[in-house]
Each structure stands twice: as structure tokens, then as C-alpha cells.
Amino acid sequence: REGDQARILFAADVKAAGYAVYDVRPASGVAKSSALKAPERTLENRIYRVELDANGDIRSIRDKRAGRELVAEGKAFRMAVFEGNPSNRYPAWEIMKETMDKPGRPIDGDVRISIAEQGPVRATLKVERSYGPSKFVQYVSLTDGGDDDRIDVRNTVDWSSRDVLLKAEFPCAVANAKAAYDLGLGFIERGNNTETAYEVPAQKWVDLTDADGSYGVTILNDCKYGWDKPADNTLRLTLLHTPSTEKRYAHQRTLDHGVHHYTYSIVGHTGARTEDALVAGEALNMPLVAFVAPKHAGHLGRTFSMLAASTPQIGVRALKAAEDGDGYIVRCYETTGNPVEGARITFPAAIVSAEECNGIEERIGDAAFEGRSLVVSAGKFAPKTYRVRLAEPAVRSTLAIDNAPVKLDYDITAYTTDEFFTYYTIDKALGSFAAELIPATVECDGVTFAMGEANTDDAVLCNGQTVALPADRTYTKLYVLASAVEEPRTAEFRVGDRTYEAEVPLWKGFYGQWGWYGNSEGFMQRAKIGYLGTHRHQTDLGNVPYGFSYMYLLTFDIPEGATTVTCLLYTSDAADEL
């Protein structure tokens, strides 16, 4: 608790692609869980008993449901360092096999183990330790009422070691010559390390199921992608890679230096459960988002779901508005490697029409549907894209703001097509916005901006011009899309008798960047992006790939009686604030 604010943890039940409303009330006593326990160096819930050794590594995980041990006898699930990590050709991109063939060293400096949480919903052990100049903090957690079959290991690492590879090792009490690796769309089975394939990619999970299929261990992670399998019973996840190099790319000797936050999790299961691994991996990587809202009746009730699949064989990867505004686009795929027939994706309203599309939302043919359900059939790991049009809801809620455009006297051509980018430029580098990316209208935060026409005057270059605000009604907010041309600027906007200052970043470049120790400083723009282009035009280079372009959203109060604004802008709208 901090002042009049408190952090609380509770078990929530939320439907797929939906929300649930909970209210918080003071209670006379503290809720207790009979399942959660945290005696010395031990965690226990209704599913697992987890024991740490004196070094803070996980020496035992007992699955009480199946009566199985997850950790190989005499071993531990742990982080380990591999010292001597040379690479002189492509240090950031390669790891040498001789590095990984060395025995890993434990991280055992200055070990401190304490209880961080012991509540009715979650119990957590905190492990602090060091390796040379690098500092490690781990939080090992079990829950009661949440994802209780998942053991989370959250990590914060302040890393400054050199010539070292850091991995998490999982020597399991199950063994198999092959493991299943998540590819994002499906999975692949791979064997143990070879001379040429010893560091392989996976997305959110890797599963090792015993050769007899009786029991398995799934390792989840939220941001790491390199794995290896040195033995039938061992998985390893690459965490940090700081190579030594005497020749090329010498600055990469400090690769990965800095503070890192990552989580890996352990799930035990009976049988071969790759579809459960998919669900668990998604749950770790897309946790519930909680926020506080004022009490109100609302239109949709205390719970709502935008869609739900009838079987875990169908994974929904995206639900979005169609690019042309006509209906919704659903992207899904078959998850298990077995064809599926007649699966259903159900929506909250009746489907009026449905069609199968390709990846760029072009029609392929009609799709089957019944009532509120889209009928899906797919081959092994096959991706599918559908467009669905839903019946109008009885109650429509909108985030749109009632806005009106401000008339501008355009005096510069900022958006060009491929045929004209050599004729019109906006900066000394001879660049321009790529018109093929700019729609007729841009919507941001519920405000719609009407964009100018390409290859003609379509923007205003600041020169102290005064622009009249709409006079048909009283407006309370001014919304502006603006960018700086040659360098970031502090711009002045005079709205009526009130003056505002706004930081306007450059129209191109990077919005943010990690810092590289001893080489560059990290940064992130503070302005809100109103429009983002994935490439731009430049006279000598043509279409510049990954040459991002931006227009930033600025918002100002309109004082009572204001009729004009003097500003630097590309386009603007005056609007009521709802």
C-alpha cells in the first residue's frame, strides 16, 4: 500500500478475447489459501512442490497429480554461464559449438534467498546472487486460482560480464531423442545437438515428452528464441550472449550489457500435450491487462467475449478491422499438425456474410457460417484468413470524437508517388512521405483527419501563418498532426489568446532505440504517433526500406472565444471532447 493506493492480486476468470468486471471492497479479514505454502526454500500449491537448493536453483519439482518428478536426480534447473565465448567473424549472430560444449558454471556469488510473497493467490521466493560484476534477481512463483500448473521464474539481470554466454539449463527426469519446438504457426520436432545444428530457434515454448508418451515438461518463455538440446533429457534456453572478438565488430564485446527483464516458466503434463503448450505459451506472453474504471452501467454487462474457438485445434492469431473498412478480418491456423473439419469460431453477433481471403485480404471464395459461428476447416498447421460481416448490434458504442476539419491553405508537397518523388521533396536529404501508404483519412484517438492529395500541395510549412478555426459551433479541443522537417523543434502554437509549446520530433528516423554500452545512447520520443509509414521516398534512393516516417498527434485546449490558431502543422481538426 502506498498512501491511498494499494496493489492487489486476485484470481480472475475472463473469457477469450473479452473482459470481465470486478469490484473491490474492503474486507474485515484476510483471505487465506490452504493450498499455498512457502516454508524454507520451498513452494507448494495443489499441483506442485518446488524445492530450491542452497544456491537458489530448483533441485526438485514434484507433480502431485501424477506422482512424477520433473528434475533429473542430482541436477537442478538453473542459470549457467559458459566462459570463453569467442567469435571473430559475426559475433552478434553466431555462437560457437566449442563454447556450448563446455560445462556450464553455476551462478553462486552472494546468494540470498527470501520470501517475497506469501498471500492467498501467489507465493514467491526471491533469489539474489551475482557473477562477477553482474547481478541477478529471480522470483520463483506458484499460484492458487490462476495458472496453477505453471511455475514462473521472473528475472531481472544487470549484466556487465564479458566473453560469456548465459543459458538456462533444464535437465529433466524425462528423456526423448526429439523435442517439439514452437514455430509460431505450428511446431517442429528436432533431435539433439549436432556439429552443424546446435543452436535452434523456437518462439514461445519447447516441449520434451518422455519417449513412452507418459509424461512431459514444457518450458515457456516470454522473449528469448535460441535453444539447444545437448542430451535426450536436457533443454537449454539462451538468455544473454556477450562474445569476445579480436578482429571485426569490436564494439560487440559489450553486446547485451545492461538491465534485462525476462521470464521463463515450467509446466509438467501427462501424455503428449503440445496443444496445451500452445495455450500456456500464449497465456504467459499475453497476460491479462487490468485497469481501473469508474462505476457505470455499460452496454455489454459484466462479461463479454468478442470471439471463441470451439477447439484448441484452431488458434486465432488476429482479429482486426478490414483494411478497406468492410467487416472484420480473422486470421487463424490449425495448431496440432492434424487436419480439422467443421471447427467453429463464434462471435457476439449474427454473421451476415463470410468469405475466405488471402493474406492481403483479397477474396478467394465464400466461407461457411451458421448463426454467430464461422465454420473452419484447415489442413495440418494451415493458416486461414476470413472476412466476416456481423449484424448491427442493438446498442452501438463509439470512441469517435465529433470533429470538424480545419481548412488549411496548403503550400508544400509532402506526399509523393513513385513517379514524382524526384520532383517534390521536403528536406535537404531530398525526402518525402510515401503517398502509397497514406489513406484518404487518418484516424487517431477517435479523431479523423482528412489528408491532402499526393503530388500537389498537401501540407503547410510553418511560416507564422494564422488559420481560422471553424465558426459553426463551439469547439473545445484542437488536434494537430505535425512533424519537424530538418531537426526536432520546439514549436509554438497560439490558440486564441493562449500560447502552447510542443516538442515536435523529426518526420523520419527511429522513434526509439536501445543504447549500446560505450557506443550509443538509448532514447525514445515522447510525442504520440498519429501516423506511421513503413518506408519513405528519397530522390537518390527511391523507396527507402525501413525508412520510417511519422506525423505526431498534438492536442491543445481551445480557450473560450478563440477563433484562430497560429502554428506549424500538416493537418488539423477542431473537435468536441467527449
Where are these regions (language model features)?
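N-terminal/edge-of-domain interface segments
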Residues: A394-D573, L578
